[in-house]
Amino acid sequence: MARNKIALIGSGMIGGTLAHVAAREELGDVILFDIAEGLPQGKGLDIAESTPVYGASVNLKGVNDYAGIAGADVCIVTAGVPRKPGMSRDDLLGINLKVMKAVGEGIKAHAPNAFVICITNPLDAMVWALQKFSGLPTEKVVGMAGVLDSSRFAYFLSEKTGVSVADIHAWTLGGHGDDMVPMVRHSTVGGLPLTQLVAQGWMSQAELDAIVERTRKGGGEIVNLLKTGSAYYAPAESAIAMAKSYLADQKRVLPVASYCSGQYGLKDMYVGVPTLIGAGGAEKIVEFDFNADEKAMFDKSVASVNGLIEACKGIDPSLA
């Protein structure tokens, strides 16, 4: 049986962390790609030299040519410029759209059968553009955002309640930005909806509201603390969870940026929704029932994503 091949397009902080985790978990052979000569080779060699310590039998290679990703089963895209303090994800649009064009063309030419996970911000617009540039089937191109945002939500809930993260199921939908929608009614701690936790005195409504707001600002909190970059450990782990569900046909339902073709009343756009990920890629979108407040928040988030998509079309007319 042939080994899986994982191509990591972008060898910065997230790319390097992805390579380390993928190697340690033996998901397959790892190719690190970057346009910066020496960077993917150096990180690949460093991680390869660590594998005898933990006994992982994987091959790692760094490349500067898209030909090196040929035949990849999974491509995880982190290429682009990260956020700096004071920047929103949307500020990256013009720069990273050009990067997505080059990446999409590279994947189309050398790894057209891959399952593609995009991490580059602004996420929802970038994954939409990447699918257009690559021409891959929409079910084979997804964005990593909701897994990360939901993980942050779950961690903050665990921190407040003292309950293990293993018994917390948090959902965050919508665009990956300040208008994201942490789903209070659909998230649970020990099986109890968060609304019931408030009623039982685990936390006040004000404390829950603060956790929801901290979740929305979670990425910015880390950017401000680091001062020279953005989060990379949690984003990498989130993408690995998505890749594993695809490679092992786990059929996990994860909140990811998926292509909507009528679901949630949306067409021809990517946004964060619960998605069943298996060997076919994004196999099915799960549709939550929204109350009036949730729908209003989701619609606002969708409007923000639509604005970014329209901006992409303005920058690159080939996307119109």
UniProtKB/Swiss-Prot annotation:
List the protein's name: Malate dehydrogenase
Q: What class of enzyme is it?
A: oxidoreductase
UniProt-recorded Gene Ontology molecular function terms = L-lactate dehydrogenase activity; L-malate dehydrogenase (NAD+) activity
UniProt cross-references to PANTHER family, sorted A to Z:
L-2-HYDROXYCARBOXYLATE DEHYDROGENASE (NAD(P)(+)), L-LACTATE DEHYDROGENASE
Q: Which domain of life is it from?
A: Bacteria
Q: Where does NAD(+) bind?
A: 10-15, 34, 96, 119-121
Which EC number applies? 1.1.1.37
Q: Where does substrate bind?
A: 83, 89, 121, 152
Instruction: Print the keywords alphabetically.
Output: NAD, Oxidoreductase, Tricarboxylic acid cycle
Phylogenetic lineage: Bacteria, Pseudomonadati, Pseudomonadota, Alphaproteobacteria, Hyphomonadales
Give the similarity note: Belongs to the LDH/MDH superfamily. MDH type 3 family.
Q: What does this protein do?
A: Catalyzes the reversible oxidation of malate to oxaloacetate.
Q: Which reaction does it catalyse?
A: (S)-malate + NAD(+) = oxaloacetate + NADH + H(+)
Give the source species: Hyphomonas neptunium (strain ATCC 15444)
Q: Which Gene3D superfamilies match?
A: Lactate dehydrogenase/glycoside hydrolase, family 4, C-terminal, NAD(P)-binding Rossmann-like Domain
One short Pfam family name for this protein? Answer: Ldh_1_N
* Gene Ontology biological-process annotations: lactate metabolic process; tricarboxylic acid cycle
Active-site positions on this chain: 176 (proton acceptor)
